[in-house]
Amino acid sequence: MVELSSEVPATPSLPADLPAVLVQIPVYNEPAVVERALEAAAALDWPRDLLTIQLLDDSNDLTTDIAVHAVSRLRARGLTVDHVRRADRSGFKAGALAAGLARCDAPFVAVFDADFVPPSDWLRRAMAALLAAPRAAFVQSRIEWGNGEANWLTRAQRLMQDAHFAVEQDTRFRRAVPFQFNGTGGIWRRAAVEEAGGWSHDTLSEDLDLVLRTHLAGWGGVFLMEPAVVGELPQRLDDFRVQQSRWSKGFVQVARKLLGPIWRSTWSTEAKIATTVSLCTQGIFPVVAIGLICLAISVVGHGGLAAGFRAALWIWFAGMLVILIGMTWGAYRRLNRGGAARYLVTAASVPVLICYLALANADQDGNEIGRAHV
């Protein structure tokens, strides 16, 4: 694995001769956001003769009609926009991205899910960072959440996502160990994608799969705290559960596929352990749920639990609190989310949410989880 330096210049300069860039927007039945996504891509500050926008439209509802009119308007303004329709949804998002790549030879490929909106200067800043690191396969931006204040659920999710980006992703990048491409808000170097074997749809986490395969091929990545890309969080528990269940299944699939090659690779021990921990993180939900249930039993009349076991439960609980606060408080302050009281209220909902996910996932009937783009 290449040891990329994390010391990317704060404002790296772009070369005089800019490369061609392809912007891919995969969409499936998202009529409320497809036009906004196209307009955001069109507003990116990049020479028009070097920018191609692909709408990878697998929809079977009115999304396609809205897209046809939006694409027509953008073409009338002089932009190159390719509205890609497939005969079937084979490979789902990964299949759509691969099909789009086959239609354009641009050396750099930005990917945005339809409900994510980049600022107009995002492409110039992200490309500058990527070009400054010749062995970087991709650049990933932090994601800001436009509906983070919608309700208690989005506030709890934002707290966890802030910890993921501002602590986990940033630390992994600075430590030169593999970190995630989050499926949106980033740019791929085509040469790295092709060397790693391209997009694969044999897991539900095609982005994580590709990241690890590029690292195994000797590439690295760049993480940017700024500029952030604005996205949306699930506002309903059912939507959140489906999203998290899909991610959990995808992580397990990637672990089965790649942990062997990772541990047989020449990566550092730190990188191997960090990646293994990341792939196994989804297992924390049932562990925390069981631990909290046992703790509750021990509080109510000791529940017949041995004194030593009760003591161990409290030590475990204290350790979990330290991890939760350590991961979330720093990110909360770094991103100026508010005061301590507001933080405590939001943080208190996280264990409840984890228990809900563990119980909800255990209750699933084993049917394949519906595919989505985020």
Language-model segments: residues:
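Cell-envelope/extracellular polymer assembly enzymes that use nucleotide-activated donors
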Residues: 19-22, 52, 194, 209
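N-proximal low-complexity "stem/linker" segments adjacent to membrane-targeting elements
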Residues: 1-39
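Long helical/loop segments within the catalytic core of UDP-sugar-dependent glycosyltransferases
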Residues: 71-108, 120-204, 215-216, 237-276, ...
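Short, acidic, metal-binding catalytic loop of nucleotide-sugar glycosyltransferases
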Residues: 39-50
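A conserved acidic beta->alpha catalytic loop
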Residues: 47, 57-67, 88-90
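The conserved acidic donor/metal-binding loop of glycosyltransferases
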Residues: 59, 113-117, 202
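Catalytic donor-sugar/metal-binding loop of nucleotide-sugar-dependent glycosyltransferases
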Residues: 202, 211-230
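Membrane-embedded multi-pass helical conduit in multi-pass membrane proteins
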Residues: 13, 281-371
